[in-house]
Amino acid sequence: GLDHLLAMLAVGVWAGTMGGKASWRIPLAFIVIMAISGLFSQGLASVPVIESGIAVSLMLVGRLIVLAIKLPVVMGMIVVSLFAVFHGVAHGVELPVAASPLWYVSGFVLATTLLHAAGVIAAASRNDKSQVLMRLTGALIATTGGAMLLAN
């Protein structure tokens, strides 16, 4: 849903604002952990804490964008990996009964990769005027996460 879309874009934007190796290592860490979590959570019942974890991930990554926080690359990878567990489990428990797990995971990995890339590209093409827009986007993402958390 919208929560996953915003999270994937946000991770890409944040990684892109850090530049260098962070722009590909941080999204890659997210993708790998999300895929593993998705594979291992298939057939599990949905747990309400998963949706709360996704909402918190939006709040925190949105704040990282707003405040233009640049962490060491490994620390950034760890942060997004924790969030990726929630997103992966959410995808895994939603596996349709008739779907092939391999194709299903491949689909959400491809979609996530494209959304991360869009975020990285948007961040890489920023200028002084788009800095404000980038921070407003981060604020909207964080606010959406907060609203989702309150709704849970």
Regions found by a protein language model. Give the residues of each.
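Membrane metalloprotein/metal-transporter helix-bundle signature
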Residues: L2-N152
